[in-house]
């Protein structure tokens, strides 16, 4: 039996949008694409200029959400992933209540990463430098020789939280 495809009416607000949609539907039906009339070239510096790279990183990785993984990587409490590709060390985990949490992957004492693996499962995150311990909610839970740190406020020294969300199976 042949497959019958029905087209739904689209809510289009302008002639330009209508033309774009019609072109896309025509291209799909004809298994083709629109091609530009001539080969285009741009300056090679668009791809090699370090200043442009810095601008792109500042805009794309600092002002917009980034995808760091799939929810399947964080299916159970304690599972975590790290992400370092944007120049910011990120740690994402699922806490004991099942909520996603994201933090700077940086110990608040001396700046070491508290998770060095790309992914894994942990009950706590421990800094390899001085063994400060953080729970799955990012709270500082312990340190060796706490009597040497009597003047600090442990509540204010948790991992630095970052915004995080789940959309369409992506984190």
Show where each model-derived region lies.
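Residue-level signal for well-ordered alpha-helical segments
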Residues: 29-33, 37, 45, 60, ...
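Rieske [2Fe-2S] iron-sulfur-binding domain
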Residues: 73-171
